[in-house]
Amino acid sequence: VAYPTGSDTMYHIFRGDYVYNSIKEGSWYPIYNSMWYNGVEIMRYWAPLTAYYMALCQMIAGGGQLAGYLIFVGSVCFFNSISWLIIGRKMNRPYLGAFVGLIWFFMPNNLLALFVEGNLARSLCMIFLPVFIYAVCEYLSGRKRIYIPIIIVTFALMAMCHLGYAGMIALAVLIYCIVYMFQQGNKRAVLEVIVSILLGFMVLGIWLVASL
């Protein structure tokens, strides 16, 4: 078996390495990469957060690309568990949260994204997805205002990892909200959740508009 596995893994490693070396040279937002295809705007069509996180992992690894990848995999597993542990404590079910946190990384879809597809951006989204879904459900049930900024921030972070995946999540939540509205009749809460997701998109406007 080749190491590291994943169809797109080396693309993410290369991009993280390019950002890492650009930052070392004083360029914190590299725009153009002449080594990719016939030259490409590396931050225009691909969400930037994964590249910066890969660069951070490479820095922690002392500059080693593959060591940085291993740190990425380990940190995704760790932060996935932390997300579920926090949710479990909030729901007064810490043991259930800890159990789900342990198995979340090993769910078939998550393993497929990380080790078969090599979609490190989607794997990074998995850290924020449980918190986002939890915040949406809690707001719909109790309309506590504290969950609004959590929805906005977590959705924006997912969009900064993988814009297309964030769009699919937004569509799934929209369908859920429509069903919830017909069942519970709480149109205002549903509208506020949808507006919060739209605000998550709007926060990224300075990058999002230019990337389209």
Language model features: what each stretch is:
Residues V1-L212:
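Membrane-embedded transmembrane-helix bundle of lipid-linked glycan/lipid transferases
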